[in-house]
Amino acid sequence: MASLQFSSQFLGSNTKTHSSIISISRSYSPTPFTRFSRKKYESCSMSMNGCDGDFKTPLGTVETRTMTAVLSPAAATERLISAVSELKSQPPSFSSGVVRLQVPIDQQIGAIDWLQAQNEIQPRCFFSRRSDVGRPDLLLDLANENGNGNGNGTVSSDRNLVSVAGIGSAVFFRDLDPFSHDDWRSIRRFLSSTSPLIRAYGGMRFDPNGKIAVEWEPFGAFYFSVPQVEFNEFGGSSMLAATIAWDDELSWTLENAIEALQETMLQVSSVVMKLRNRSLGVSVLSKNHVPTKGAYFPAVEKALEMINQKSSPLNKVVLARNSRIITDTDIDPIAWLAQLQREGHDAYQFCLQPPGAPAFIGNTPERLFQRTQLGVCSEALAATRPRAASSARDMEIERDLLTSPKDDLEFSIVRENIREKLNGICDRVVVKPQKTVRKLARVQHLYSQLAGRLTKEDDEYKILAALHPTPAVCGLPAEEARLLIKEIESFDRGMYAGPIGFFGGEESEFAVGIRSALVEKGLGALIYAGTGIVAGSDPSSEWNELDLKISQFTKSIEYEATTSLQAIN
């Protein structure tokens, strides 16, 4: 990680009248004063790499232009095409900037349904927030303590945003080197609190220093993108938006950006059909685990041996498994994700697919952090039990989970580690509740929320650097656990268990990329899961837990054992 050096950036604001536009929000800055050069990451298929720009030089403008609301995606598409043409005829007089054109739609349409209609245009992304109904809102509690959230920035203006789908890339951020503070500043350069829906969606590798396997190469060490065309689903309404980003210093002019957007807009479909709950229409021909069951048991025993050594500081390590499935036909990753979404209202759903890359999809229950201006919230999630068909049996399992010494140890390690890390970057930390059970569709976990208040928004990078990786996906101490994982695991986790989410000018939110799969045409899918090994862990129980965690993926595909096909090594 780069050293934590922060610099302030002046952002002014201005508004001007624009025909057919009912509101404009903008931040703009003085003329660029320096040019910063760094090693380029080659990619000719996507706009410009924002990491190659001078993060010390503010953009000329960051603005959002909102058109009048319409009734349908078709009308919104027509309105956007017209607005892009108008922008081309009356261009902003800046050498760099970001302009978001957005059209509200007076009906709620699923963002994932819109994405499915776009005929696999790449790059593409999807991020769906989970439902937090029934859980305390610690960010809101902190806001109320400071006067009902007025002026302290702990309440989001987009709290009813349900999910986001995007295609194309107005600007992307990618490199083979680990994500650094400079990279974070490069992303923040394209964002503004006055345009809160301009966001960079993406993720980072679990181990940024590890060797990148071929299936993960297109993702680099990290990958983020501000979509060219974006569909926002809100509670009760929707929005179609287009974003243009340019920087003359990166040889990507406003004219280049508009032409690229117009090409993408020609491919946008306005015919949106709701994805129905139906079979994916594929059968599994073979399934192979890495490690195999025979190799996994000794790996757990080795981890336990280290944990039980008095001279070893290690008290937890998370060992993962990679399950490759080969299917008779290609799996549609968006249709697969839609099935997960129907079951996973209490989880984040995501899809991340750079151009020419497999689709990384997931249905993760775990939040890494959410920042709303100065408020930051994280959570501890650990220990696993299955759900039961009857409520009486389900309560028995819940009581067993709450009273298990082994599970309490695993959970306490996670919670106290996150509390310690937040204490290092926040002026105070609230934990509520200390321990409870969080029930998902197929499993239940021990759970707690933690929240605090940053001294300044620029501390956001510190949150990411401090919290990732959590003990829930790596272990404790983190470095000792990482080294053991590197020694034991024979596959590349890639972005599995890494931070997945978005950076925004007003708000950022990241989930932990667990319960996830990498889907590629002609190659089936790689499904990832992991379990925490602590003193008292049983290899057989941990293996069964891995099967339980991937069941949300495998349940939707009919498995047909075929003896004529060999397992893949």
UniProtKB/Swiss-Prot annotation:
InterPro entries according to UniProt: ADC_synthase (IPR005801), Chorismate_C (IPR015890), IsoChor_synthase (IPR004561), MenF-like (IPR044250)
Gene induction: By pathogen infection. Systemic induction during systemic acquired resistance (SAR). Not induced by light.
GO cellular component, one term: plastid
Localization terms from the record: Plastid, Chloroplast
Effect of a null allele: No visible phenotype; due to the redundancy with ICS2. Nevertheless salicylic acid accumulation upon induction is severely impaired. Ics1 and ics2 double mutant is seedling lethal due to photosynthetic lesions induced by the lack of phylloquinone.
Organism domain of life: Eukaryota
Similarity remark: Belongs to the isochorismate synthase family.
Oligomeric form and interacting partners: Monomer.
Function: Isochorismate synthase involved in the synthesis of salicylic acid (SA) required for both local and systemic acquired resistance (LAR and SAR) while SA synthesized through the phenylalanine ammonium lyase (PAL) pathway seems to potentiate plant cell death. Also involved in phylloquinone (vitamin K1) synthesis. Has no isochorismate pyruvate lyase (IPL) activity.
Protein name (Swiss-Prot/TrEMBL): Isochorismate synthase 1, chloroplastic
